[in-house]
């Protein structure tokens, strides 16, 4: 019985994109299909560790590639776990994977088709070279079924009880007319070597071997008759008569005989078992692509072994690009493959490395873990904890080595800086080493980024703190009023523009005995001479009345108004409490859909307003307030200064309309416009209309 199903909309869209768009790199389809077959073999082998009977009559796990020139088909077959009917329907058509939409978006943004495997939709790459695909699959839990589609929006699933598959999956590609090159033996050998040489199972390619054998005329006639029945003609080559008498009596000829047989294409032993000195850069790149489905080579490699009480070998690869779903909350990490004595155990062991290292790819092969270890036991296993600790240690070594190459480290940091910062937040043991990997723009670094270590070496004599500000962008922070005094004193300020920086700075307090000081918060004081301190005290006393008046006008909008020692050219700013949220953090938390309102209210407490006593506006405001505390223009100016301080300090306006009204009033003052006269002009047409209406009514009454 045959059933017809419609493809899920996103899958149908993806297939249409693959079929109707020209891509030169079509060869990746074979890599994707072999990779899927390898995964299927991994799954059945893992099951067999606890239940040997699942292998049944097909104990040998292998992958076969079979070209058929006569029927113009290419078959990829494995003896893996196979698929049930439900698997065929769901996995190959009706349920879109999370990566389907992401992959299409990546393609439309100019991405390479080679990335398809990273998004979990590699099977559909078959339609790059085939106009029809047939999938026959047999799972131990179900009968055999055949899935087939020509990508016309639907697919069929048919029960196949007479299938010769004992277990596994057979994918038959009916090749397009212009893709017949993938039936050539040499082409297939090259592709397997290029993309799949280090797959952990035998990849058997069906090849044709031609041999020559001598036959007598009688044997040759019989062979010719037999081949004639089969529609073939033997190729004959004459040989010279020998001197032997028997040879003269029985004339012999050489006949070419063609036999088909499977030949293993990936004969190299596992790469991680070899000495790193004997492995070439090309072999590492090939192996990395095989285990990661990446189309690019890795950025860097760490190949190491640990011996002693505990033995294991590992290869860690650092990709050039971050995975598209790296920080998805429900994503299961499958970046490190776990082997025990060369036997694959699993590729989603989340306890093998911490979450912040989830971008690393690689393999770990342990000599000490039991083959039949369960996922539950892994979490408590002491050996695994030691392996995890060593992976983190070697990863840090890899990053430190990479830091020696400025260009490569820049590529790494652009892609994975968030992971490094997440590590600082989560890994207190390695926090100091991770902090050395940080890079920031600063007021002195220009377009380059600086390390914390370099910042400390450039600190001014007597400078006790590492100064920094947080915000949306480097451009905004370069003109921030918070850094004015620091710049005037020749002190460098770090610019932290990544939202995760806010969380990082909650965990770190100092670096090389130098405390961090956020210039947007209270409690920041620059070193002053005795004369400067005296002058500051005099200014505070002189402006005490203005500060008090401003507080009375602003009321609950501010905690207090004080004389600033961090401003140089701006009239005023708003600073937060030392342990509260910065303006940037407030903005981040406001955008959190599930934020804790009570926590937000506590952390977003009233701000302190700081005024610059050297600024002309503040001086004039002081004069006006001292002359008349009820001066309306002075009150308007205080509110206007508060609102502009909100904006320049990185906060949002509570009442934009009131702010606009004040600006409009100031514009009128600048243009010497009279509010009362303007109101009379605005009311005149209304009054005229009213009088006109009244007059008309009166006339009607007279009539």
Swiss-Prot record:
Segments for region (Disordered): 211-247, 678-703
Cited PROSITE patterns: HSP90
Top-level taxon of the source organism: Eukaryota
Localization per Swiss-Prot or TrEMBL: Cytoplasm
Single GO MF descriptor: ATP binding
GO CC field: centrosome; cytoplasm; nucleoplasm
One GO BP: response to unfolded protein
Binding site for ATP: 36, 78, 123, 375
Segments carrying motif TPR repeat-binding: 699-703
SUPFAM superfamilies reported for this sequence: ATPase domain of HSP90 chaperone/DNA topoisomerase II/histidine kinase (SSF55874), HSP90 C-terminal domain (SSF110942), Ribosomal protein S5 domain 2-like (SSF54211)
Pfam families, sorted: HATPase_c (PF02518), HSP90 (PF00183)
Record's keyword terms, sorted: ATP-binding, Chaperone, Cytoplasm, Nucleotide-binding, Stress response
Listed Gene3D superfamilies: 3.30.230.80, 3.40.50.11260, Heat shock protein 90, C-terminal domain, Histidine kinase-like ATPase, C-terminal domain
Record-annotated disulphide pairs: none
Record carries keyword S-adenosyl-L-methionine: no
Keyword hit for DNA damage: no
Ranges annotated as biased composition (Basic and acidic residues): 224-247
Matching InterPro entries: HATPase_C_sf, Heat_shock_protein_90_CS, HSP90_C, Hsp90_fam, Hsp90_N, Ribosomal_Su5_D2-typ_SF
Function according to Swiss-Prot or TrEMBL: Molecular chaperone that promotes the maturation, structural maintenance and proper regulation of specific target proteins involved for instance in cell cycle control and signal transduction. Undergoes a functional cycle that is linked to its ATPase activity. This cycle probably induces conformational changes in the client proteins, thereby causing their activation. Interacts dynamically with various co-chaperones that modulate its substrate recognition, ATPase cycle and chaperone function.
Family the UniProt entry places it in: Belongs to the heat shock protein 90 family.
Swiss-Prot/TrEMBL domain comment: The TPR repeat-binding motif mediates interaction with TPR repeat-containing proteins.
Subunit-structure text: Homodimer.
NCBIfam families (alphabetical): PRK05218.1
PANTHER family per UniProt: HEAT SHOCK PROTEIN 90 FAMILY MEMBER
Protein name as catalogued: Heat shock protein 83
């Amino acid at each position: 019985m045959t059933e017809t199903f419609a493809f899920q909309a996103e899958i149908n869209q993806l297939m249409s994109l693959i079929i109707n768009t020209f891509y030169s790199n079509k060869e990746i389809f074979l890599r994707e299909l072999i990779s899927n077959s390898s995964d299927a073999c991994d799954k059945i082998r893992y099951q067999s560790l606890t239940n040997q009977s699942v292998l049944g009559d097909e104990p040998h796990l292998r992958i076969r590639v079979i070209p058929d020139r006569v029927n113009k088909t290419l078959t990829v077959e494995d003896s893996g776990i196979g698929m049930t009917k439900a698997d065929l329907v769901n996995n190959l058509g009706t349920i879109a994977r999370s990566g389907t939409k992401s992959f299409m978006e990546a393609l439309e943004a100019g991405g390479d088709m080679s990335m398809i495997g990273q998004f979990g939709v590699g099977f559909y790459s078959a339609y790059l070279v085939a106009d029809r695909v047939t999938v026959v699959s047999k799972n131990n839990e179900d009968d055999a079924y055949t899935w087939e589609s020509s990508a016309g929006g639907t697919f069929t699933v048919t029960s196949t009880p007479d299938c010769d598959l004992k277990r596994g999956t057979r994918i038959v590609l009916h090749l397009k007319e212009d893709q017949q090159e993938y039936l050539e033996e040499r082409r297939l050998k090259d592709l397997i070597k290029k993309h799949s040489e280090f797959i952990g199972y035998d990849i058997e390619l069906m090849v044709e071997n031609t041999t020559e054998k001598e036959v007598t005329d009688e044997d040759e006639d019989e062979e010719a008759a037999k081949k004639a029945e089969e529609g073939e003609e033997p190729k004959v080559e004459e040989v010279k008569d020998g001197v032997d008498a028997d040879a003269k009596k029985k004339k012999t000829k050489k006949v070419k005989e063609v036999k088909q047989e499977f030949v293993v294409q990936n004969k190299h032993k596992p790469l991680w078992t070899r000495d790193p000195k004997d492995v070439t850069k090309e072999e590492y790149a090939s192996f990395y692509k095989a285990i990661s489905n990446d189309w690019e080579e890795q950025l860097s490699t760490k190949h190491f072994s640990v011996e002693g009480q505990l033995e294991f070998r590992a290869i860690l690869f650092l990709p050039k690009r971050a995975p598209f779903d790296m920080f998805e909350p429900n994503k299961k990490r499958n970046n490190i493959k776990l082997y025990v004595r060369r036997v694959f155990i699993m590729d989603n062991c989340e306890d093998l490395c911490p979450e912040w290292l989830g971008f690393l790819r690689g393999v770990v092969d342990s000599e000490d873990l039991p083959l039949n270890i369960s996922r539950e036991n892994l979490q408590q296993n002491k050996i695994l904890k030691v392996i995890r600790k060593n992976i983190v240690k070697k990863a840090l070594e890899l990053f430190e080595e990479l830091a020696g190459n400025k260009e490569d480290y820049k590529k790494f940091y652009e892609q994975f800086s968030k992971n490094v910062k997440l590590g600082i937040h989560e890994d207190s043991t390695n926090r100091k080493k991770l902090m050395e990997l940080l890079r920031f723009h600063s007021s002195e670094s220009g377009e380059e980024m600086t390390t914390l270590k370099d910042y400390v070496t450039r600190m001014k004599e007597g400078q006790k703190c590492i100064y920094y500000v947080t915000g949306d962008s480097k451009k905004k922070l370069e003109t921030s009023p918070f850094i004015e005094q620091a710049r005037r004193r020749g002190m460098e300020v770090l610019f932290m523009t990544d939202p995760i920086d806010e969380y990082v700075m909650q965990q770190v307090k100092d670096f090389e005995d130098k405390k961090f000081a956020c210039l947007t918060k209270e409690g920041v004081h620059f070193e002053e001479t005795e004369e400067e301190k005296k002058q500051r005290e005099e200014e505070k006393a002189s402006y005490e009345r203005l500060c008090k008046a401003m507080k009375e006008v602003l009321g609950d909008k501010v905690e207090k108004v004080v004389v600033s020692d961090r401003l140089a050219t701006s009239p005023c700013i708003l600073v937060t409490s030392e342990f509260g949220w910065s303006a940037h953090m407030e903005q981040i938390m406001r955008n959190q859909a599930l934020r804790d309102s009570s926590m937000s209210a506590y952390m977003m407490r009233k701000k302190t307003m700081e005024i610059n006593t050297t600024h002309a506006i503040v001086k004039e405001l002081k004069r006006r307030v001292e002359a008349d505390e009820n001066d309306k223009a002075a009150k308007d100016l205080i509110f206007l200064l508060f609102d502009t301080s909100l904006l320049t300090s990185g906060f949002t306006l509570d009442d934009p309309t009131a702010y606009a009204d004040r600006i409009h009033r100031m514009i009128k003052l600048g243009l010497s416009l009279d509010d009362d006269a303007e109101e009379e002009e605005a009311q005149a047409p209304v009054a005229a209309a009213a009088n006109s209406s009244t007059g008309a009514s009166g006339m009607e009454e007279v009539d």
